[in-house]
Amino acid sequence: MALTWNSIISAEKNKAYYQSMSEKIDAQRSLGKSIFPKEDHIFTAFDLTPFNDVKVVILGQDPYHGEGQAHGLSFSVLPGVKIPPSLRNMYKELAEDIPGFTIPEHGYLKTWAEQGVLLLNTVLTVEEAKAHSHAKFGWETFTDAIIKKINDDMEGVIFLLWGAHAQKKGANIDTSRHFILQAPHPSPLSAHRGFFGCKHFSQTNELLRQQNLSEINWGSVTSS
């Protein structure tokens, strides 16, 4: 039977850690706290990128914690929302790295997800205006299980690990079966330390070509 995110996520939801985490999040919601993203957006990354379609994983940390920003894809924001600084820097690198890439006026990365780029945060919820507020709730265990499934059941996936948090998260990826590209985080605090000039987007496409897989059209965001 082909693996699906539905079966993988259902198995995790039955575990004690997940049920405990759900109770904590529900308790916060019932106190009137704003939790991002909205409940029906928590698993957007999995909805847009089916398990067997995953070619690339871009690991983020926790969701954006401003009103209307987070929608379940790492680094991405919905159309009409101001482009966050880290994504702005990703676009700058793309413009240098990919011939013809035009920086879009929005930060909506859905077209990447639809091409097999799993835009995965390591923590999937956050309280409004409180970065990392759900970091210890259990999401790290959940996303460890997600990464392990990709590691164990797929071949040739390209992991883009930017910054110490993502690199630590990817420490157990089998590099004899998968590819890891590492750089500093694209945030304004660290982008100049080696994210700019890393050429990860063109390198990703080169690695896909070597496997006879279709490249990611990174510029698809401009026309979307």
From Swiss-Prot:
<dbReference type="InterPro" id="IPR018085">
    <property type="entry name" value="Ura-DNA_Glyclase_AS"/>
</dbReference>
<protein>
    <recommendedName>
        <fullName>Uracil-DNA glycosylase</fullName>
        <ecNumber>3.2.2.27</ecNumber>
    </recommendedName>
</protein>
<feature type="active site" description="Proton acceptor">
    <location>
        <position position="62"/>
    </location>
</feature>
<comment type="similarity">
    <text>Belongs to the uracil-DNA glycosylase (UDG) superfamily. UNG family.</text>
</comment>
<dbReference type="GO" id="GO:0097510">
    <property type="term" value="P:base-excision repair, AP site formation via deaminated base removal"/>
</dbReference>
<dbReference type="GO" id="GO:0005737">
    <property type="term" value="C:cytoplasm"/>
</dbReference>
<keyword id="KW-0234">DNA repair</keyword>
<dbReference type="InterPro" id="IPR036895">
    <property type="entry name" value="Uracil-DNA_glycosylase-like_sf"/>
</dbReference>
<dbReference type="GO" id="GO:0004844">
    <property type="term" value="F:uracil DNA N-glycosylase activity"/>
</dbReference>
<dbReference type="InterPro" id="IPR005122">
    <property type="entry name" value="Uracil-DNA_glycosylase-like"/>
</dbReference>
<dbReference type="Pfam" id="PF03167">
    <property type="entry name" value="UDG"/>
</dbReference>
<comment type="function">
    <text>Excises uracil residues from the DNA which can arise as a result of misincorporation of dUMP residues by DNA polymerase or due to deamination of cytosine.</text>
</comment>
<keyword id="KW-0227">DNA damage</keyword>
<dbReference type="InterPro" id="IPR002043">
    <property type="entry name" value="UDG_fam1"/>
</dbReference>
<keyword id="KW-0963">Cytoplasm</keyword>
<keyword id="KW-0378">Hydrolase</keyword>
